C-alpha cells in the first residue's frame, strides 16, 4: 500500500483516493486542502473541472484501487452520491457508504468498516462534509459482533461474484 513519509494522520501516514463527477467537483476541491490539514494525502483522480462527465468513469478509478489494496480508503462525490455508491459497491471487498450526516459517518466505520465514503455534493454543505470526513477518518472499526456480519457479506461476495 502506498505511503507518504511527509504526511501523518493519527500518527501514521495515509493516502486517500479522491474522485468526483461534475456534480461533486466543487466539494472535492474544498476537501483536498482539508484532508491535507488533517495530515492525509489526497490522491486526486478527477474530474478536474465542472464539465459534464459520467460518474462511473471516475467511481471505478477509486473502487478498483481500494478493491486491489492499492489504497486503504477512498472518497467519491457526485451530485446525490447515489450513482457513485452503485458503481463502487460493484467491486469485491468494497464497502462504500453514502453518508449525509455525522451519525451515519461514524456508524459506517464503526459497524460496517466502510472503506469508501460517498458524499452527495449537491446534498451536503461544505462544512458538514468536512465534519463527515473527519469523523469517518477518525472512527475505527469496532469489530466484535460487527465483524461476524461483515464475514457474512464477504461469504456472499465469494458466492455471488465467482465470475
What are these regions (language model features)?
Residues 17-19, 23-24, 102-163:
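C-terminal binding/interaction regions
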Residues 58-98:
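Helix-adjacent hinge/juxtasegments
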Residues 41-52:
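A short beta-strand-loop structural module common to alpha/beta enzyme folds
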Residues 18-38, 42:
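Glycine-rich phosphate/diphosphate-binding loop of Rossmann-like nucleotide-binding domains
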Residues 3-13:
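Short, Lys/Arg-enriched N-terminal segments with co-localized hydrophobic residues
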Amino acid at each position: 500500500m502506498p505511503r507518504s513519509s511527509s504526511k501523518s494522520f493519527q500518527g501514521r501516514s495515509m493516502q486517500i483516493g479522491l474522485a468526483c463527477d461534475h456534480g461533486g467537483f466543487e466539494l472535492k476541491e474544498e476537501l483536498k486542502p482539508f484532508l491535507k490539514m488533517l495530515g492525509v494525502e489526497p490522491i486526486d483522480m478527477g474530474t478536474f473541472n465542472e464539465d459534464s462527465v459520467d460518474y462511473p468513469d471516475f467511481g471505478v478509478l477509486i473502487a478498483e484501487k481500494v478493491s486491489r489494496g492499492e489504497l486503504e480508503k477512498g472518497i467519491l462525490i457526485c451530485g446525490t452520491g447515489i450513482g457513485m455508491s452503485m458503481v463502487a459497491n460493484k467491486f469485491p471487498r468494497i464497502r462504500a457508504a453514502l453518508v449525509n450526516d455525522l451519525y451515519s459517518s461514524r456508524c459506517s466505520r464503526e459497524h460496517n468498516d466502510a472503506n469508501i465514503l460517498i458524499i452527495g455534493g449537491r446534498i451536503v454543505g461544505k462544512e458538514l462534509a468536512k465534519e463527515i470526513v473527519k469523523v469517518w477518518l477518525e472512527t475505527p472499526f469496532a469489530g466484535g459482533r460487527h465483524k461476524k456480519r461483515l464475514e457474512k457479506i464477504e461469504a456472499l461476495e465469494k458466492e455471488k461474484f465467482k465470475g
